[in-house]
């Protein structure tokens, strides 16, 4: 019998984003990454500990696959019954042929094999956690840069507060 290791509660997205940035501040500073957080006060239901873990993995990937003058941008949007947290970097991107497989266990992709040593476990774990927590996860890359989005469902109460 396994106990669930998460607690979903109402969290202001900027708070979990700032916590994740603080967790990774040494890595970000050492690699001269410019960080921008667009904050419009959006709220979502989540387990902040695990969402921080997911964001730290995304930050780690952005640093690993950075270009000169690396930057990270966190932004939120509301579409229909969802709040979307997007993390965009200006790194080397992900080849189109690799995109469908980025969540597969052990998949390192072309860049993971040629540019950096990669285990292929990070995004796989993120996807598993998102599935457990009821959060959507998508990755988009158009050659240069990558955008990773966490998609939080919102209920009627939250929609009323934020709408």
What residue spans do the PLM features occupy?
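Conserved micro-motifs of the catalytic ATP-binding
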Residues: 2-6, 39, 43-46
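Short conserved segments within the C-terminal catalytic ATPase subdomain
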Residues: 27-36
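Short helix-loop "hinge" at the ATP-lid/N-box region of the Bergerat-fold HATPase_c
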Residues: 62-63
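Short beta-strand/loop element within the Bergerat-fold HATPase_c
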Residues: 69-81
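Acidic ATP/Mg2+-coordinating residue in the GHKL
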Residues: 89
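Short conserved segment of the HATPase_c
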Residues: 94-107
């Amino acid at each position: 019998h396994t106990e669930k290791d998460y607690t979903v509660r109402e969290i202001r997205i900027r708070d979990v984003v700032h916590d994740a940035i603080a967790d990774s501040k040494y890595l970000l500073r050492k690699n001269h990454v410019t960080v921008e957080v667009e904050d419009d006060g959006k709220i979502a239901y989540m387990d902040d500990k695990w969402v921080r873990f997911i964001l730290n993995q995304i930050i780690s990937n952005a640093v690993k696959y950075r270009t000169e003058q690396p930057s990270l941008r966190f932004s939120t949007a509301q579409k229909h019954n969802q709040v979307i947290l997007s993390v965009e970097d200006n790194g080397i991107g992900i080849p189109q042929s690799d995109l469908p497989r980025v969540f597969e266990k052990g998949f390192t992709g072309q860049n993971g094999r040629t540019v950096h040593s990669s285990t292929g476990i990070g995004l796989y774990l993120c996807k598993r956690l998102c599935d457990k927590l009821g959060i959507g996860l998508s990755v988009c890359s158009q050659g240069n840069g990558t955008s990773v989005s966490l998609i939080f469902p919102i209920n009627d109460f939250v929609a009323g507060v934020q709408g």
